[in-house]
Amino acid sequence: MSDLQKLLTEFAAGRVALIERHEASARTVSNYDFNNTYQYVINREETHLSWLQTALSEYGVVLPPAGADALPPPPPPTRGQKVESGAFRGILDDDARYLGAFVEKWRAPVNAITHARHRNMLNVILGESIEHQRFFEQAAAGFEDLLGRRTGGVPRVGAVLPTRWLE
């Protein structure tokens, strides 16, 4: 296994761990605006994983599982009549911290890569991870207009269900 293949595989395992954590968090965080942010982040992370899969396919390798990089799931969702947005602060803080740790771990190794295409791809992923970290930090601080402002002063009502499809 080449050094680049090893780095790409380990980086991908870390990304798999993050998306698994964010999917679990999205099932827990019922605040509509915060959950929309998770959906946006997960969508971008799926794109990142497709890029990594393409890079790994050059070596005949598939995306690895999170394995040792797996992150703990968030606590179970709070149920009740009205859940305050502050109830999700711990989950949002944790997700921001996990993204920050991922970027910190990989910044120097990625910058040392001599393969320009893979280095640039990984730097884009790290840059977007910093953006996602900022989203979660803002949400943890209680800022709900992360992806845009509501029009006409319409109040926030309702919550997101933890399961997409009910049968």
For each predicted feature, which ranges?
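Iron-associated oxidoreductase/ferritin-like identity signal
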Residues: 1-167
